[in-house]
Amino acid sequence: YFDGRIISLIPESLEIISNEILGEIISKKANILAGPTLGADPIIGGVLMKAQENSIQLQGAIVRKAAKEHGTGKQIEGLIQSSDKVLIVDDTCTTGKSVLMAAKATEKHGCSVVGIICVVDRDEGGRQEIEKSGYKFSSLLKVYNRKLIPWV
């Protein structure tokens, strides 16, 4: 079992992840990095810091499975607007359900999703589900025969 949250909580690996994802943001011209809470939270924070260091305009957003029943009642936390171009991120991709939920929630908000990226593709059908739903998918690492293969 690969716990993607662990590597995103180690500063050295989070820096590598953040640099790679920032490159994707630049190439896809996204202005929002969003993802499902909890796996995406540290990644979004790391990428936002890298963007700030490089004078790149970028905002973050966290997507809940469902809207809160109290407080603001929001499903998406962050300064997100209907004209935004969003890159969805998560630590791992197994079935694709969590990133698809986040993508659909941001589209419901009026945004366009320019792609989905995960740190690790577990190669358990998630990529296929995401692409079948019409999204472009990439990952930094892929599990192949129970081994991690870099930079897919």
Model segments located where?
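PRPP-dependent phosphoribosyltransferase catalytic core
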Residues: 104-152
